[in-house]
Amino acid sequence: MATTLVTVRYPLTADSYRTIERGLDGYEDGDSLIILHVSLLQNGDRISRGKLQAAVEAEFGEIPAHYVVRRGYVLEEAIVDEAARQNADHVFVGKSKRGRLRRWIGRLLGLYPDIEAELAKNLNTKLEIVD
């Protein structure tokens, strides 16, 4: 059983749809699929899991996913925290988030690591970038 974390923006964008599609591509019965939106506190966003689920299901129909909305100030921190919390095997992010994740982890660790290598080493997680 694999756990896949798919990060999206709300309202959903074209990048969000592509990221969800990639997460669904590898889904098998018994796997855990988690759709994550980080609601940034500094933006005053207040998105409910129900709204996120309704938006995803309007495009993809009912899918076997858990919907999570995290609130935080730092997008990258919330994604890494949720990946660790869920013990994710795969994390799918849009290409625009890759650079931000790399910089955030670089600041956190005092260097600029290969984000894929760091997630694989420290969390046993595979990161996939969706173009």
Regions found by a protein language model. Give the residues of each.
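Structural motif corresponding to alpha-helix initiation and N-cap regions
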Residues: 17, 73-77, 113
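Active-site phosphate/pyrophosphate- and oxyanion-stabilizing loops and adjacent acidic/basic residues
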Residues: 21, 54, 80, 117
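General small-molecule cofactor/ligand-binding pocket signal
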Residues: 34-36, 66-70, 128-130
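Gly/Ser-rich helix-loop-strand patches that form or flank binding pockets
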Residues: 90-131
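Mid-chain, well-packed structural core segment of small domains
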Residues: 61-98, 102
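Intrinsically disordered or low-complexity boundary/linker segments at protein termini
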Residues: 1-16, 117-131
